[in-house]
């Protein structure tokens, strides 16, 4: 009932986990239990240890990317975060070298990388020798990657999102937000992502 005060929809959410070899799949099921349309967004918030070993720095590590065809993109376009947790209309392009984006000391200075439009379906963490040690696979239209700037935090988050926070120029209803999802009465939404330890 507390949720209903700020989000005027009744829903049923199921989250499941499946372990298989060196991977874990996370499954979501959202059911609209209203007698009207429901608008929603859902996303994951997994964080991964980085750097792996004592004496290493996160800035020595690299992010690798694959698109939906398993190919390595030449560049990524990031939607830039602004003040107050909203995205701006600004875009920033990152050129990749062999599909790799170094996690230098300034990569997250502007907050998170927000990669939209199904540009990628897999993010890989690579150690200083460019050895892949962890991957996140997903079908989500967006992925958000971040680590606290200027804090040398020992983790990086790789978050598949079905939906996104508001844009700084957004002025409308929930149903009109970019990347918002809609379910008719009684309908269900299902999605998943997979974490693979290499």
Feature-to-residue mapping (PLM):
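Hydrophobic core residues within well-ordered beta-strands of beta-rich domains
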Residues: 13, 24-26, 189
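Asparagine-centered strand-capping/turn motif at beta-strand->loop junctions
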Residues: 28-34
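Glycine-rich active-site loops that engage anionic ligands at enzyme catalytic sites
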Residues: 126-166
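Short, structured beta-strand/loop micro-motifs enriched in basic residues and often containing a Trp
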Residues: 168-176
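Extended, loop-rich substrate-binding clefts of extracytoplasmic carbohydrate-active enzymes
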Residues: 1-21
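Short Pro-Gly-centered flexible turn/kink motifs
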Residues: 28, 181-197
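Active-site/ligand-binding surface loops and adjacent short beta/alpha elements
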Residues: 37-39, 47-138
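Beta-strand-rich interaction surfaces with strong enrichment in secreted/lumenal proteins
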Residues: 14-16, 178-183
